[in-house]
Regions:
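Localized chelating/binding microdomains
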Residues: 16, 26, 49, 75-84, ...
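Intrinsically disordered, low-complexity regions enriched in Pro/Ser/Thr/Gly and acidic residues
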Residues: 104-248
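Short, glycine/small-hydrophobic-rich surface segments
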Residues: 59-106
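Membrane-proximal N-terminal amphipathic helix
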Residues: 36-70
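Generic hydrophobic segment detector
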Residues: 13, 22, 36-39, 87-133
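Aromatic-residue hotspot detector
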Residues: 9, 77-79, 163
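N-terminal single-pass transmembrane signal-anchor helix
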Residues: 2-41, 45
C-alpha cells in the first residue's frame, strides 16, 4: 500500500524550532557571561585584599630598593643625591612604613615609602628601656616621604572597578598609614578621609578605628557591592578581611 512520501517539517515548525533553540542559546550565553563577570568581581575584591595585606608585609619586612646614590641626613625631610655610592643601611634614615592614598576618582591607590630621620637615642633609658609610648616615639621620629626621589607605586582595582563610599556610588578618597614603631617594632594603622593631613597629624588615636572600603562592581554583578574592612587598631595583614553583600 502506498503510504506516500515522508512528511517534512512545515515552515511554522521550523521557525518554532529555531526560535526555541535561539532562546536556549541566548540563555546559556547570558548565564555564562554573568558567571564570568561574577568571577571577575570576586577576583577584583580578592586582589584588593591581597594588596592591602602585602603593604603590611612591606612595613614589617623592609625592602630597601633605593638607588645607591641616594642618602639621608639626621633630621632631614628628603632624600639627597650623593656623588659617591652609599651602601644600603648606612644612612641616618630608616624606612618605617607605607603611606597609601586613594585618588579622588577612586580608580587608583598610590603607595609611598615612609622614612624616619630623627635620632631616637633619647627615646630609651640607659638600660635600654623605651621611654614613652609608641605614638609619642612615632610622632617624634621625623616622618617624611619624598615624592621626587622616594619609591612610589600605583595600584588600580581590577576589571575597571573602583573605590566607593559605603552605600553610595560616590568615589572614596582616603589615606592609610601603616607604620612600624622604631622603638618597639609594633605595627600600627592610621586611616583618615582627609588626604591632606600631615603624617604627624595622621598618627592619632582618632584615626585607629574600623574602616570599611568598598569596591563598586560597575555593572559586573547586580548584587550589592563588596569590599574589605580594616579592624580597629589593625596590627597586621590579618586585621584586613573581606566583607560581602549588604555591608557595602
Amino acid at each position: 500500500m502506498d503510504r506516500g512520501s515522508p512528511r517534512g517539517f512545515t515552515v511554522i515548525e521550523t521557525m518554532l524550532f529555531l526560535a526555541v533553540s535561539g532562546l536556549l542559546i541566548m540563555g546559556i550565553l547570558i548565564g555564562s557571561g554573568g558567571a564570568i563577570n561574577a568571577q571577575r568581581y570576586k577576583d577584583a575584591t580578592n586582589s584588593l585584599l591581597s594588596y592591602f595585606q602585602s603593604q603590611y608585609d612591606r612595613a614589617a619586612n623592609v625592602q630597601n630598593l633605593r638607588d645607591t646614590d641616594l642618602g639621608c641626613a639626621t633630621g632631614g625631610t628628603e632624600l639627597t643625591v650623593s656623588d659617591t655610592a652609599i651602601s644600603r643601611g648606612t644612612t641616618d634614615c630608616v624606612i618605617i612604613g607605607r603611606l597609601l592614598v586613594a585618588s579622588d576618582s577612586g580608580e587608583s591607590i598610590s603607595a609611598r615609602t615612609v622614612y624616619a630621620s630623627s635620632d631616637l637615642s633619647n627615646s630609651f633609658s640607659e638600660s635600654g628601656a623605651q621611654l614613652g609610648g609608641d605614638v609619642e616615639v612615632i610622632k617624634n621620629s621625623g616622618l617624611f616621604i619624598d615624592d621626587d626621589l622616594g619609591e612610589s607605586r600605583d595600584y588600580a582595582p581590577e576589571w575597571n572597578t573602583r573605590l566607593v563610599q559605603a552605600g553610595t556610588s560616590d568615589p572614596d578618597a582616603w589615606q592609610i598609614l601603616i607604620i612600624r614603631s622604631p622603638a618597639s617594632s609594633s605595627i600600627r594603622t592610621y586611616i583618615s578621609d582627609d588626604t591632606g593631613l600631615s603624617l604627624v597629624d595622621l598618627v592619632d588615636a582618632s584615626n585607629e578605628g574600623q574602616r570599611l572600603i568598598c569596591l563598586d562592581s560597575r555593572g559586573l554583578v547586580m548584587s550589592g557591592n563588596r569590599g574589605v574592612v580594616f579592624s580597629a587598631g589593625s596590627t597586621g595583614g590579618s586585621g584586613v578581611k573581606l566583607v560581602g553583600d549588604g555591608q557595602c
